[in-house]
């Protein structure tokens, strides 16, 4: 700067008669000065321009454009999924290139209703939070009989009255038989969900996600609340949690599980999460993964690896649902559905349950933890899980009268006596720990299609292969399945009366425990396995918490119910 000032000073002397060299130098400096002046003038003008234009852009033009866009969005036709086209375009620009066509890309989602479609790759405990809205409301009350979600449920004083959402995230052949009717000339080709995925091949993703999106909807939770229920037990297989190699549709169900919990919250319904299928299959049954496969705690290296993998899953899952937003709604956590005590070492299963309990607690889940009785009954669990060392534990008992040749063959009134007397006494005398009935149904036969596996018949009418053609109905001859499988509108009055008594006797007995969950909320066509269908047909009480006086266990010996002893098979 000083050199420039000196040059300018010397040039001022030009008029005082400086030499030609100095004159030439001064002309060069004059050019530089002119250029600097021009640049400074431009810069000042630009600043003035921006000071005027920028406020106009941010205060007038952009808000006006946003207003126009909102109006266009309001009037624009939506796609058949209910998503505005502009929103789709906007969302697609949010998804980074590396996430395109991944589980995080909302443009690949079949449905975006009630999902937060703002892109995020955030995780908690290794599980994606994609699709969840930040805000939630825990002030909702399912019915006047129970407290709102933000107040503690009085477990042990007020029975749970709930229903299962089975056959949804964890598919089962008898619940949705239409998926499993694939066969050739000699045999059925699809026996379980994983073989269904394999059969569908490249179509598996679209077919299975469509099932996720339609079999359980927002309306489902509204109807459950309308039926007077207050809990839902959501069953799921491990492969929905995150991508893995066991199936090409893995990971998709996770966001549907999270959305369903929010739908339950909106209706004031508390959730019992239940792992229904563990790595390797914990029981070899069709709802555990691959039918007739059991590589879980079976004494093999692979079985041990899978049992430890299951604990790792609980570490992630329990940590995720220990978050504050879930404490009022996910109040029960199931360790594992129906591990096979008939085949596996019961001591190993018991030890594994202790490990699972420890992992879940160390992951900061503070709610109730349920352990399956594995069909062993409610007794003797206190020898292994004393309340001091294992607080807030539930024994999950499943009760059916149709999978046992003796029980299924009893006459109608005798079945009611088993429920009202035998089961009632068993719960009273043997259930030393808090006990729930995690599954029960209205079915008095095993006639539902594919109930005993795809392509297998029924004990009731003698078509169940292991029974060698021997029917199990009380008459042993002339046993038919058509009466149980027909439309309930065609049921005879005596059969309707019996089924209602079968329902209310179980409710009365199970209300004396910590509560119950009916299996299942809905099916494609098996009425007696569907709470919804049976409820609409008048075979269940109008409100689960308010049973009528039409039947109770004390009425079994009254003359009006002696007819159950006299009637033949329906």
UniProtKB/Swiss-Prot annotation:
It is found in: Secreted. It is an enzyme of class 3 (hydrolase). Glycans are attached at residues 91, 116, 121, 184, 203, 248, 364, 525, 552. One of its GO terms (molecular function) is glucan exo-1,3-beta-glucosidase activity. It catalyses: Successive hydrolysis of beta-D-glucose units from the non-reducing ends of (1->3)-beta-D-glucans, releasing alpha-glucose. GO terms for cellular component: division septum; extracellular region; mating projection actin fusion focus; membrane; plasma membrane of cell tip. Belongs to the glycosyl hydrolase 5 (cellulase A) family. This is Glucan 1,3-beta-glucosidase 2. It comes from Schizosaccharomyces pombe (strain 972 / ATCC 24843). The gene is exg2.
